[in-house]
Amino acid sequence: MNRIIKKAKTLKGEITPPPDKSISHRAVMFASLAKGQSRIKNFLWAKDPLSSLNAMKSLGVEITITDSKEIIVNGKGLHSLKESDNVIDCGNSGTTIRLLSGIVAGQRFLTVLTGDDSLRYRPMKRIINPLSLMGANIMGRAENKFPPIVIKGGFLKGISYEMPIASAQVKSAILLAGLYAKGETTLTEPHKSRDHTEKMLKNMGVNIIINDNTVKLSPVDHELNCFDITIPNDFSSAAFFIAGACLVPDSEILIKQVNLNETRTGFIEVLKNMGATIEIFNITEQGGEPVGDIFAKSSSELKGINVQGDIIPKLIDEFPILCVVATQAEGKTVIKDAKDLRAKESDRIKAMTSELKKMGVKIKEFEDGVEIEGPCKLIGTEVYSYKDHRIAMALSIAGVIAEGETTIKDANCVDISFPEFYSLLEMLQK
């Protein structure tokens, strides 16, 4: 499905973004490993988290959904999973296939994991190597590069592992395998990635010690606690509307009850450094995470800056929309140390370079990032989403500041994380 975007005169209103995708995945997976009944409210009913929910059902977990869309997971404990009688399809979800690999690495049965056309070309060596070191028998296609992957779990041992890249998915896979391992599991990242897994496992009674970029998980000799959680709303989804408010003249948007985990909010820090007007208030706690309301409004003078180093993992999902913001900033914006973006749902560095060039942007591509010279007058044209939800939404925000009409090809990929995106965008223009 294609979507035509027209230039917006203003964006005004109040929105509630969808529930957090990362926490939705983890809630349904971790509840499946706990002993007892867990209740999950405000789950993200989108394709990616549903891949995780259906995967756990395939492994024998009893999951029911109430009329009010609350999920009830009857967990039978760490060692209660059963071998699936079929290949488990993880859809488009890298989170599902990587976290699930860590879980089934500790099971004494065979599991085969695959996904859609995009997922079958996502790199898997980054989890296959450490899980193999822990004792799992695990193989992937094309010399362990890609899915499908076959895992014969068994007796695991804890390892001390230096991660070559900062990745919450890889970190989580190893920590989940560590739940089944004999001995301590220690991980060190080059930069700190999002920490939802550590927070949630701690709340379930797992002994986890965090020291800067190092996480240490002690052997688990008891069942994990079940839990009730109301999932906060997704910062990465809110980011598109934060950017829209900053870029479209005479705009004001209030975004309600957003997850403000410090490992996720680098985008706000960068936008403020560029001169954006953004306020955060009504901060409380929900689901073990800080949440609050975000108010963003038009920013008349943005300036280009350098974005690199420790902040990159804190805005890794916001790279596409940050590129769009940079097109309207005075001077050069340079984004570096983001090579892992080449292995997301699409090659996001290549995709944003290609599509923004079509819209008239001065953009240079590096191996690990981009340089954008602004401000640029964007020209509406036909652009391609690469079937990547974050590319589609970023280009849609580019469309609302471009002259003429912008056509987003394969725009329905937004259903992966944010099915209501276009209806909210239209509502803010009325």
UniProtKB/Swiss-Prot annotation:
EC number: 2.5.1.19
Coiled coil: none
Keywords: Amino-acid biosynthesis, Aromatic amino acid biosynthesis, Cytoplasm, Transferase
Reactions catalysed according to its record: 3-phosphoshikimate + phosphoenolpyruvate = 5-O-(1-carboxyvinyl)-3-phosphoshikimate + phosphate
Chain positions recorded as phosphoenolpyruvate binding sites: 21, 94, 122, 169, 348, 390
GO CC annotations, alphabetized: cytoplasm
Entry annotated with the keyword Chaperone: no
Residues the record marks as active site: 317
Positions of 3-phosphoshikimate binding: 21-22, 26, 167, 169, 317, 344
Molecular-function annotations in GO: 3-phosphoshikimate 1-carboxyvinyltransferase activity
Main EC class the enzyme belongs to: transferase
Domain of life the protein comes from: Bacteria
Subcellular localization(s) per the UniProt record: Cytoplasm
Gene Ontology biological process terms in this record: amino acid biosynthetic process; aromatic amino acid family biosynthetic process; chorismate biosynthetic process
Family matches, as PROSITE patterns: EPSP_SYNTHASE_1, EPSP_SYNTHASE_2
InterPro entries from the UniProt entry: Enolpyruvate_Tfrase_dom, Enolpyruvate_Tfrase_sf, EPSP_synthase, EPSP_synthase_CS, RNA3'P_cycl/enolpyr_Trfase_a/b
Biochemical pathway: Metabolic intermediate biosynthesis; chorismate biosynthesis; chorismate from D-erythrose 4-phosphate and phosphoenolpyruvate: step 6/7
Intrachain S-S bonds: none
PANTHER family: AROM/DEHYDROQUINATE SYNTHASE, PENTAFUNCTIONAL AROM POLYPEPTIDE
Chain's role: Catalyzes the transfer of the enolpyruvyl moiety of phosphoenolpyruvate (PEP) to the 5-hydroxyl of shikimate-3-phosphate (S3P) to produce enolpyruvyl shikimate-3-phosphate and inorganic phosphate.
Record-stated family: Belongs to the EPSP synthase family.
HAMAP family: EPSP_synth (MF_00210)
Subunit: Monomer.
Protein name (Swiss-Prot/TrEMBL): 3-phosphoshikimate 1-carboxyvinyltransferase
